[in-house]
Regions:
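Conserved SAM-binding loop
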Residues: 135-136
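Conserved SAM-binding motif I beta-strand of class I
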Residues: 121-126
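Conserved SAM-binding strand-loop segment of SAM-dependent methyltransferases
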Residues: 143-151
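S-adenosyl-L-methionine
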Residues: 1-99
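Conserved class I S-adenosyl-L-methionine
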Residues: 97-107
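Short conserved loop adjoining the S-adenosyl-L-methionine
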Residues: 154-160
Length: 281
């Protein structure tokens, strides 16, 4: 959804209209749009509201019932961390006893929501105005969370009282996936350098990242959700109680909710070394 469509929804009329819509039903979308225009709403506002209604329906797979109170863009939703995964991220910060987390490259605020949901004060930062606006809306239920539209690397973390960081560098440009970590925005090396100021650092990275790009003194964990490998994350300092190495977090959905198990690679304490390839039997 274009930025001007997001702006339309942030007006009193736009928010009221969006809040009045029923759950998305593709068989009713055309007739609903026609009815809303006949009521006097502008075509642009109707299009924005119906697009958001459809995005919320898609977002339920990642955010469950919380999606109905959030705002999304198509790109933001695609890149957002699933709530089941971000909850595990947030648990690391809570267990480490940190007092304020900076979510750098927060996007629509998915990870910041999980952190704030554990009563952790959060400073969410994104340089994209539309993303920052959506994160502001999505974090409204949490008075201990704030959002800034700024370059993540220009934030003075010490001055802001931040003692932990979660970073999600942009890994796409013009719709194309970027595989070189030094071409991410910001570059992986720039993000890892934040450890000199804030040792408690977590970085979301692509699951297919070259092992040579992983810091040898950190713990890297790959995450699988219902059989799909969705991400990897680098955990540093107090956020890595396992110590240097690598592991896999496996999440499975079922009738009793989500179950989790962790598999640790016992063969190495250096995640920058590629896994041993076993000969086929």
């Amino acid at each position: 959804m274009a930025e001007n469509h997001v702006a339309l929804l942030l007006t009193p009329e736009g928010w009221k209209l969006l809040s009045s819509l029923p759950p998305y039903d593709p068989s009713e979308a055309l007739s609903l749009g026609r009815s809303l225009r006949e009521e006097g709403h502008s075509p642009a506002l109707v299009a924005a509201a119906l697009t958001q209604q459809r995005l919320r329906e898609r977002a339920a797979a990642k955010f469950g019932p919380f999606a109905q109170q959030m705002l999304f863009t198509a790109d933001g939703l695609e890149q957002a961390t699933r709530l089941t995964v971000s909850a595990h991220h947030a648990a690391r910060y809570a267990a480490a006893g940190v007092t304020k987390v900076a979510d750098l490259g927060c996007g629509i605020g998915g990870d910041a929501v999980a952190l704030a949901g554990l009563d952790l004060p959060v400073l969410a930062v994104d340089r994209d105005e539309a993303a920052a606006a959506l994160a502001t809306i999505n974090l409204m239920p949490f008075p201990h969370a704030s959002v800034e539209c700024a370059d993540a690397l220009e934030i003075d973390l010490v001055e802001r009282g931040v003692d932990a960081v979660f970073a999600d560098p942009a890994r796409r440009a013009e719709g194309r996936r970027i595989t070189d970590p030094e071409q991410w925005s910001p570059a992986l090396s720039q993000v890892l350098a934040l450890r000199e100021t804030v040792p408690a650092l977590g970085v979301k990275v692509a699951p297919g990242i070259d092992h040579a790009a992983l810091p040898a003194d950190a713990h890297t964990q790959w995450v699988s959700v219902d059989g799909d490998v969705v991400e990897a994350a680098i955990w540093c300092g107090p956020l890595a109680p396992e110590g240097p190495g690598r592991s896999a977090l496996i999440l499975r959905s079922g009738a009793q909710g989500t179950t989790a198990c962790t598999l640790v690679d016992p063969s190495t304490t250096d995640p920058s070394q590629p896994p041993i390839q076993l000969d086929p039997i």
